Curated annotation (Swiss-Prot):
<feature type="active site" description="Charge relay system">
    <location>
        <position position="121"/>
    </location>
</feature>
<dbReference type="Pfam" id="PF00561">
    <property type="entry name" value="Abhydrolase_1"/>
</dbReference>
<dbReference type="GO" id="GO:0003986">
    <property type="term" value="F:acetyl-CoA hydrolase activity"/>
</dbReference>
<dbReference type="GO" id="GO:0005739">
    <property type="term" value="C:mitochondrion"/>
</dbReference>
<dbReference type="InterPro" id="IPR029058">
    <property type="entry name" value="AB_hydrolase_fold"/>
</dbReference>
<feature type="transit peptide" description="Mitochondrion">
    <location>
        <begin position="1"/>
        <end position="19"/>
    </location>
</feature>
<keyword id="KW-0378">Hydrolase</keyword>
<keyword id="KW-0496">Mitochondrion</keyword>
<protein>
    <recommendedName>
        <fullName>Ethanol acetyltransferase 2</fullName>
        <ecNumber>2.3.1.268</ecNumber>
        <ecNumber>3.1.2.1</ecNumber>
        <ecNumber>3.1.1.-</ecNumber>
    </recommendedName>
</protein>
<comment type="similarity">
    <text>Belongs to the AB hydrolase superfamily.</text>
</comment>
<dbReference type="GO" id="GO:0016740">
    <property type="term" value="F:transferase activity"/>
</dbReference>
<feature type="active site" description="Charge relay system">
    <location>
        <position position="145"/>
    </location>
</feature>
<keyword id="KW-0808">Transferase</keyword>
<comment type="function">
    <text>Alcohol acetyltransferase that catalyzes the synthesis of ethyl acetate from ethanol and acetyl-CoA. Can also function as a thioesterase by hydrolyzing acetyl-CoA in the absence of ethanol, as well as esterase hydrolyzing ethyl acetate.</text>
</comment>
<keyword id="KW-0809">Transit peptide</keyword>
<dbReference type="GO" id="GO:0052689">
    <property type="term" value="F:carboxylic ester hydrolase activity"/>
</dbReference>
<feature type="active site" description="Charge relay system">
    <location>
        <position position="294"/>
    </location>
</feature>
């Protein structure tokens, strides 16, 4: 996808005025398993799951999927807002290292024992980095359509996304009390970004009401719309850092933590170079292909949920087999131990 150079030029003038914090306190939603017919299926996940959204997403981006997965796997699912997203505080730096630090801190602070991670796009890269840097904290990961590589080719897309959000708030003139604010905001986005599915994904950031938890980005004039992300301050950091990957820091780092990679068939993210990069860092990875674009979770929710459910079931079967083998080996050791002889001592 190609966007005009004017969009990139406008974005480069973004000012930075957000505070710097080592750890952001992550807002989250918790989805607990509910009674359903899924209970009759053999899908179980012994550990809780944390879901990580994509860029300009938030904790409710795929909320119906979270509940389905929680029911299917009989495990709680935490869906978090990353820093500067949803209801989590606005702060810098916006780098993968900072996001991974926030995630580790969230796991430790909430005493979540060895969770598995499911990450989409930006969240997929974050999941891989967290597992590589802190493998002792995580059980496994599901990586939705991304790979551990630098991706400068996506910078024009990210530029267009940022400009679409910014123009819909600061240049559209649409008022929050306008009953047609949704359609008007979407029309503004279309003039800046030609990716219609992405625009629908981005639109949830535009709101007619402020938040009680954090300061939303808005025009100073009365009755203007709000944006959940601090778009003017954050845009340049997104374009610079989201395509990145800390290759130098992770040179030679490899883990046996298992991951499933969900490849969207037409997105081009999981290519040959990406598969080679996966093999450098993960000794136990599986790739499953689902028909669709990068937004495959929106386009084919049941297919990806089924693929994730099957993979967790297979992982649990492996764990059960390993435990059975270990128990059998231990029992054999016990039976092979010599019986201690003793002499009867008579007391006069």
């Amino acid at each position: 996808m190609i966007f005009n150079s004017l969009s990139i030029k406008r974005l480069s003038s973004t000012x930075t005025s957000l505070p710097f914090k080592k750890h952001a306190k992550l807002n989250f939603d918790l989805y607990s398993p509910q009674h359903s017919t899924y209970g009759k299926l053999p899908y179980h996940c012994q550990e809780p799951i944390i879901f990580l959204h994509g860029i300009y997403g938030y904790s409710k981006s795929f909320n119906s999927d979270y509940q389905q997965l929680s029911n299917l796997l009989h495990t709680p699912i935490y869906s978090v807002d990353m820093r500067c997203h949803g209801e989590t505080e606005n702060c810098l730096p916006f780098t993968y290292d900072a996001l991974a630090g926030d995630l580790d801190n969230f796991v430790i602070t909430h005493n979540i024992k060895k969770p598995s991670l499911i990450g989409f796009s930006l969240g997929a890269k974050l999941a891989m980095l967290a597992i590589l840097k802190s493998p002792h904290l995580y059980t496994s990961g599901v990586i939705v359509d991304n790979v551990p590589l630098k991706q400068p080719r996506i910078k024009p897309n990210l530029t267009a996304f940022g400009n679409a959000l910014r123009d819909s708030v600061f240049k559209s003139g649409v008022k929050r009390n306008d009953p047609s604010w949704i359609s008007k905001s979407f029309n503004v986005m279309k003039d800046v970004c030609s990716d219609m599915p992405a625009n629908f994904y981005l639109l949830h950031n535009i709101q007619p009401k402020p938040s009680y938890l954090k300061k939303y980005s808005t025009e100073e004039s009365e009755n203007s719309l709000f944006c959940k992300v601090p778009i003017r301050e954050l845009s340049s950091h997104v374009v610079e850092n989201v395509p990145d990957w800390p290759e130098e820091d992770l040179a030679g780092v490899k883990t046996d933590v298992p991951i499933l990679v969900v490849k969207a068939s037409t997105s081009g993210f999981v290519n040959e170079d990406g598969v080679a990069a996966l093999x450098k860092h993960f000794s136990d990875f599986t790739i499953v292909e689902v028909a669709g674009t990068h937004l495959v979770m929106k386009e084919r929710p049941q297919e990806y949920i089924s693929a994730v459910g099957r993979w967790f079931y297979q992982q649990n079967c492996k764990k059960a087999a390993a435990l059975t083998k270990a128990k059998k080996t231990n029992d054999q050791k016990i039976t092979q131990q010599p019986i201690l002889s003793y002499k009867k001592i008579e007391i006069a």
